[in-house]
Amino acid sequence: MSKPNQLQTVLSVAACKGTRGLLRVTGRGGTALPGKAARVFAKDILEVTSSGMEIIVVTGTNGKTTTSRMLEHALTAAGHECLANKSGANLLSGVTAEITCNATWTGKPKTHYAVIECDEGALKQVVPLIHPKVIVVTNLFRDQLDRYGEVMHTVEQVRMGIQKAPEATLCLNADDSLVASLALDVPNKVVWYGLDTPVGEQKDADISDAKYCIRCGTPYQYHYHTYAHLGGFYCPSCGYHREKTQVAVTAIPKISADGSLVSMRMELPAFGSCPEKSRTCEVRIGLPAVYNIYNAAAAVCAYTAFGLPADEILLSLADVRSSFGRMETFRVGENRVQMILVKNPAGCNQALAYVASLEEDFNLVFCLNDRTADGHDISWIWDADYEQVIARKQGSDEEHAIKVM
């Protein structure tokens, strides 16, 4: 890997900015193609245009976009200039386009901080170029079967990416045995986050993505579950178990359509010198559902591991707003519409659990696509638990009105 010279840099940046400008004039988004154009003149232009930036990378199956949004919102609200790939273009070309288009003509970055959402498969290409300070892994599930195959392939893709960033601090979900396994045999500093409390009821079928110990193959047992294969896992044979968390949700007094109220414990010395050994506080999260509680914990973990004050992100979580399709709410005529994006069984089940918990009546519409960005293989839909919505009840015996369209 060799850095481009000054002429290559100028031509590369010009190609990137020019292509994006042309695409936008013609009414197109211009998210990935400008990056491809930039790399024609300088294959590793991203290493130049990101040089000197402090970067958080967020990867994982579910929650990348929302966790990134929480981090970017906190940085901006605190007065820090921050770059983020809000468009969701999270492959190498998309990341190259976002960072390079926001550089000067000579390739100097215009902002000091960046929050980059990165596809699991692209992590090994992106991180050697941008040298992130922090890498967050949200969770790992079966996803886009035609692209990734089974979940262990995804685990290995992320592992290869982490191995190319030995200086990065890892913020890992302690409740996910697959994510936790990424800490094995790497030199990186690791900070753990998770939920120290169970959530709802658990069905055996929900843990199909990680039933067996990644070390010895014995079926995991659980002290408690949160959802899918996440929770207080341990192996009764070899002793492999959930790690102690430095950022943990210890109680969830309220989950509603307007968001959640949680108690969060932070072991602050994990993030630098601080007179407090630990701190527990009440945190309001402006997005609903259990998985957004996980996203908030991940964001707090990353923000503080980044070296920034915890209060900045704790305050900002109350008014964070959803990204496109992620619990996005809007009006169509007199109707309130909420859009929930799902792309795999685990995400779908959590969305359905949220819908089933709503007290008001509603119409439910399922829309399915099989385009390249979301995967051509849609067989995953047969593994989701739609019955929990149909069977939902209010109180002890009164069924809600629901219309599935």
Protein language model regions, located:
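Gly/charged, well-structured mid-domain segments that form the phosphate/adenylate-handling core
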Residues: 240, 255-257, 302-342
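Extended interfacial segments that mediate partner engagement and assembly in macromolecular machines
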Residues: 280-292, 330
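Phosphate-binding loop of NTP-binding sites
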Residues: 3-194, 200-212
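A conserved, hydrophobic alpha-helical segment in the catalytic core
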Residues: 129-139, 230-244, 287-318
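Active-site beta-alpha connecting loops in nucleotide-dependent enzymes
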Residues: 323, 341-405
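Extended acidic/charged loop-beta regions that coordinate divalent cations
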Residues: 118-143, 182-280
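Residue-level signal for inorganic ion chemistry
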Residues: 117, 138, 171, 295, ...
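Buried hydrophobic packing segments
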Residues: 71, 75, 95-99, 296-306, ...
